[in-house]
Amino acid sequence: MTWNVWGRFGDHWLRRQRAIAETVRAQRPDFLALQETWRSDGQSQTDQLGFELGMSSVFAPSRMPRDPDPDVRLGLGILSRFPLRAVEQHTLSTGTVALRAEIRLGEDSLHFITSCLDWEEDHQRERFAQASSLASLVSELKDRGDDVVVAGDLNAPPDCPELDPLLAVLDDCWQQVYDGVTYSSHNPYLGHGEWLEDQRIDYILANDGLVPTDSRLVGFDEDHGHPPSDHYAVVADVPVS
């Protein structure tokens, strides 16, 4: 499962956070990637969710839109129902990182990676470079014989050339039953005329040995009839042997 949870933006972030927790609880993911998740005063949303849901958790700051509160830092989070064997941050470009957690599953290792590529419309070169760096990391891990999943907000639709390096080494887990728009103009938190509106920009990607059996969007109206974030969450069912 992956979700850009929109930090503390908006007037009802505390209420949104409760709805985010309930949505995740209902899905019971084995692994959860978060983007635009907050940390402040030594506490993080990722750790709070981990405590509530009984999951291991880790947070890493990364380049994100700035929160109005200067004491709030936004970044990436990973939660897992399995113990995290190793955690590492990988620099993709100035200020932007990928957060990688290695999880031991029997005799095998699964690397669960999350990132949030640059969101600005004119940052095509930056997104391409970041996707290329991610692809190099993925290829290195695959060469070891390990399974790899990348889950995150890539800020580009699937036919965008910026994502070509990453989609060359991983398969898109989205099942093409419907368009899967994660950044929708029907979402009341979306600003009017956003350049990425009505696009699928949030992904779960996996190596070719991991075949999804289902995929879906969640997070539509769990907050008193409103979505808990400006993005919808992506869930994929992927059996891991």
Regions found by a protein language model. Give the residues of each.
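Acidic/histidine-rich helix-loop elements
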Residues: T2-R18, D67-P68, D118-E126, E194
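Active-site-proximal segments of metal-dependent phosphoesterases and phosphodiesterases across multiple
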Residues: G10, L117-L134, P158-L167
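Structured beta-strand-rich core segments of catalytic domains in phosphoester-bond hydrolases
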Residues: H12-W13, F31, Q35-L117, T213-V218
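Short, well-ordered secondary-structure micro-motifs
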Residues: W13, S44-Q45, P70, H123-R125, ...
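Metal-dependent phosphoester-hydrolase catalytic domains
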Residues: S139-V148, A156-S241
